[in-house]
Amino acid sequence: MTRLNPYFGEFGGMYVPQILMPALLQLEDAFISAQSDPAFQAEFTDLLKNYAGRPTALTRCLNLTKGSKTRLYLKREDLLHGGAHKTNQVLGQALLAKRMGKKEIIAETGAGQHGVASALACALLGLKCRIYMGAKDIERQSPNLFRMRLMGAEVIPVHSGSATLKDACNEALRDWSGSYETAHYMLGTAAGPHPFPTIVREFQRMIGEETKAQILQQEGRLPDAVIACVGGGSNAIGMFADFIDEPGVELIGVEPGGHGIESGEHGAPLKHGRVGIYFGMKSPMMQTADGQIEESYSISAGLDFPSVGPQHAHLNSIGRANYVSITDEEALDAFKALCRSEGIIPALESSHALAHALKMMREAPEKEQLLVVNLSGRGDKDIFTVHDILTAKGEI
């Protein structure tokens, strides 16, 4: 049986075919031993510093906040090699794969960011890489598709279902169930069956650890709130982990509201879904009346996921974190505002978190508040999507 608790309150677990249990237990053993192995930790830390570029900056937004008493900082995961926070944990998982003697990596990707991160880690560490990607996402994210192929990854289009991230996840798990003796499944978010939610959190927690040290140095106190977008939830749990035991710091997760919650076209299962079992875990998810997984929707491919990581579900259920939603339109406005005010092009995913921070600022301009937004990735991959939308609106 497991050595670590596979549940967060009532959420989580290992709802997988029996054939995959040995692979998950082997992964848990490797993770536990690696966490207490100074050589593993030294190699991981060295890669994060000298290859990925950690620590990332904490940047104050002076222009965006003019006319208000809000002090707003961005944790700059967009500056990380690979363009997003995804690079952190794939380096950790790739080292674990080598520790277990695996020769191949299987991964799924939505926006393509986890695919790019997986491809670069495999190129660096000499692992074969095959990546499942929904056909619809391939259309939305052609630059990332080419990046993956440039770095030697095989990208397999998935045409089944909605041809998006959830379908790519299903295909990747199916592949792994037949190849786990030689392959490691490099799950891209803090979701799925145990031990993945725990592993991914621990391999992302430096985001919050660095933020805490940097904000104390720059402001002399902890923030009033840390804000992060939530799809599966890895960048958010990486930011939240070191602040969970700081009761004075509000944790705010921002789900994609899509065309508006009432439209049904969104990706906000935490607040507007029902608990079920999917992708190896028990967690809130978007379901039809008869319990089928419903298609999620977001302008940002990386948030277009019908469920959410189990630790977020737990933090929501006990009231420790507050989860809100932001529409496509609001995210787009925040995207444009950051470009024009600060000269930073954010990912559309991260723009959801920024939009909520700007909303907090606008609603209380006289309130002295210290906010940190996790800018989880850069927006290079999204410029064509945004270009098409702004062209259609006649804005450019």
Curated annotation (Swiss-Prot):
One GO cellular component term: cytoplasm
Metabolic or biological pathway: Amino-acid biosynthesis; L-tryptophan biosynthesis; L-tryptophan from chorismate: step 5/5
Catalytic function, reaction form: (1S,2R)-1-C-(indol-3-yl)glycerol 3-phosphate + L-serine = D-glyceraldehyde 3-phosphate + L-tryptophan + H2O
GO molecular function, one term: tryptophan synthase activity
EC number(s) reported in the record: 4.2.1.20
Keyword set, alphabetical order: Amino-acid biosynthesis, Aromatic amino acid biosynthesis, Lyase, Pyridoxal phosphate, Tryptophan biosynthesis
Keyword Nucleotide-binding among UniProt keywords: no
Family annotation (HAMAP family): Trp_synth_beta
Biological role stated in the UniProt entry: The beta subunit is responsible for the synthesis of L-tryptophan from indole and L-serine.
Subunit structure as annotated in this protein's UniProt entry: Tetramer of two alpha and two beta chains.
PANTHER family, per the entry: TRYPTOPHAN SYNTHASE (PTHR48077:SF3), TRYPTOPHAN SYNTHASE-RELATED (PTHR48077)
Stated name of the protein: Tryptophan synthase beta chain
Originating gene: trpB
